[in-house]
From Swiss-Prot:
Residues where glycerol binds: R85, E86, Y137, D250, Q251
Protein family (similarity comment): Belongs to the FGGY kinase family.
Protein name: Glycerol kinase
Residues reported in the UniProt entry to bind ATP: T15, T16, S17, T272, G316, G418
Cellular component per GO, a single term: cytosol
Xref: Pfam families: FGGY_C, FGGY_N
PROSITE patterns xref list: FGGY_KINASES_1, FGGY_KINASES_2
Gene encoding the protein: glpK
């Protein structure tokens, strides 16, 4: 490997695994490493991660990817970090040890408290300041829960030893040996504590949730110098201090990675969940259709770019459920085969995968998963197909809400994430939503976005125009079903979703 050549390193800390991908000047993957980590479900509706395991897993992938690429620390121009959003960690700043497991974005334990806030009439205050709705999905009520329910957290707070942050903040703090306690605007905008108009932690909301400002990180742009990694984390002989220069939450990172840099451009990521974002430019559009307003990114001293976002909680994790829980598939790659098989004996089976409630545009944390339309002749392929179609139906719900908010039709949607590899899903999505689907050559655009942000700040790449040449479209999908068939399918889906509403409150 050329000893003088430079690379960008992207750390991608996801919901189920950590990855490191190393990119060259042409945006090509030089090497990668990925390792899954443990999911904990201590009670119904609770989801936790071990923050130390996330740290050691992420570090392990960094070292593995570096070793596979056969590069030295001085070959690394910069590091970008992207992460699962909303998931929070609270830790002792002296020992570096968490006071409790990380509470994951899927966790619903604060549902009752969120209902209380809504009954108190706080919904408008929260939405007008943060762009979000009151929901256990977001970080704020999770932080409050730890402060109220974990004695060690209260004790460390009293001793002024407590720090809090999302996963990006935790990794930055660990990589810099506790020198930097910071986050970026995109992650801050998902906490339900950050004012997206003033670009500051909102004191009124902090007081409402009883969260002291002192435990929260400094908020920086998505593309600037955060600090440098201790060389010991790269190798025993490493001496070069590699800068962290790009940070963004996974979905905003994906939007940037897809180069949706103009207002009106849309992307959908098919990962653990599904996340559809539309760039709205320098203007924050507040949704009338239960989408959330978020910061897409902020490049250095430039004004922030905003986005409308819809979130689906279960997408790829529904496929994982097919594989791991009910064991009807051996791996995700089999799904297209079974969908094709189901088409030979069609049935009207609908799967609503609301295992942890419904996200946008329903926001029903009491909904639970259900399968409708089962017959004596229903086979595994019909269940698989219904699960795949549910991903597209949920994404279509988001697109429909988005089109109402912006007042015009969306014609093109860029896609990425693991499940976008499914040609069956992409074709069905195109047909059901009446959009052209564009899938790039490299679908790892979340990691690519963090690389672009770090590379832009470090001068590795000089302009957006230069970036646009790096990841061409690999395949496009165009609508292929009649309007009559589409309307019938959508009617069945809407009926199925409706029947899952308010489930946990009614039994």
């Amino acid at each position: 490997m050329d000893n003088t050549k430079k690379y960008i390193v992207s750390l991608d800390s996801g919901t189920t695994s950590c990855r490191t991908i190393i990119f060259d000047q042409n945006g090509n993957m030089v090497s990668s490493a990925q390792t899954e980590f443990t999911q904990y479900f201590p009670q119904s509706g609770w989801v936790e991660h071990d923050a130390i395991e996330i740290w050691t897993t992420q570090l392990g992938t960094l070292q593995s990817a570096k070793s596979r690429a056969n590069i030295k620390s001085h070959n690394m121009a910069a590091i970008g970090i992207t992460n699962q959003r909303e998931t929070v960690v609270l830790w002792d700043k002296e020992t570096g040890l968490p006071v409790y497991n990380a509470i994951v974005w899927q966790d619903r334990r604060t549902s009752e408290y969120c209902d209380e806030l809504i009954k108190q009439g706080k919904a408008n205050i929260i939405s007008s300041k943060t762009g979000l709705i009151i929901n256990p999905y977001f970080s704020g009520t999770k932080i409050r829960w730890i402060l109220k329910n974990v004695p060690e957290a209260a004790q460390k707070l009293q001793e002024h030893k407590l720090l809090a942050g999302t996963i990006d903040t935790w990794l930055i703090w660990k990589l810099t040996d506790g020198k930097v306690h910071a986050t970026d605007v995109t992650n801050a905008s998902r906490t339900m504590l950050y004012n997206i108009n003033t670009l500051e932690w909102d004191q009124e909301i902090l007081d409402l949730l009883e969260i002291p400002r002192e435990i929260l990180p400094v908020v920086k742009s998505s593309s600037e110098l955060y600090g440098t990694i201790n060389p010991k984390y790269l190798s025993q002989r490493a001496t070069a201090a590699v800068p962290i220069m790009g940070v963004a939450g996974d979905q905003q990172s994906s939007l940037f990675g897809q180069l949706c840099t103009e207002p009106g451009m849309v992307k959908n990521t098919y990962g653990t969940g599904c996340f559809t974002l539309i760039n709205t430019g320098e203007r924050a559009i507040f949704s009338k259709n239960k989408l959330v307003t978020t910061i897409a990114w902020k490049l250095g001293n430039q004004k922030p770019i905003y986005a409308l976002e819809g979130s689906v909680f279960i997408a790829g994790s529904g496929i994982k459920w097919l594989r791991d829980s009910i064991k009807v598939i051996y791996n995700a790659q089999e799904c297209d085969f079974y969908c094709g098989l189901a088409d030979q004996e069609p049935q009207n089976v609908y799967m609503v995968p609301s295992f942890t409630g419904l996200g946008a545009p329903y926001w029903d944390s009491s909904s639970r998963g259900a399968i409708f339309g089962l017959e004596r002749g229903t086979k595994r392929e019909h269940i698989v197909k219904a699960t795949i179609e549910a991903i597209a139906f949920q994404s279509n719900d988001l697109l429909s809400a988005m089109q109402k908010d912006i007042g015009k039709k969306i014609n093109i949607m860029k896609v990425d994430g693991g499940a976008s590899n499914s040609n069956y899903l992409m074709q069905f999505q195109s047909s059901i939503s009446d959009v052209t689907i564009m899938r790039p050559t490299n679908i790892e655009t979340t990691a690519l976005g963090a690389a672009y942000l770090a590379g832009s700040a470090s001068g590795f790449w000089k302009s957006i125009d230069e970036l646009k040449k790096l990841n061409p479209i690999d395949k496009s999908f165009r609508p292929g079903l009649s309007k009559e068939v589409v309307n019938k399918k959508l009617k069945g889906w809407q009926e199925a979703v409706k029947r899952t509403f308010n489930w946990t409150n009614s039994i």
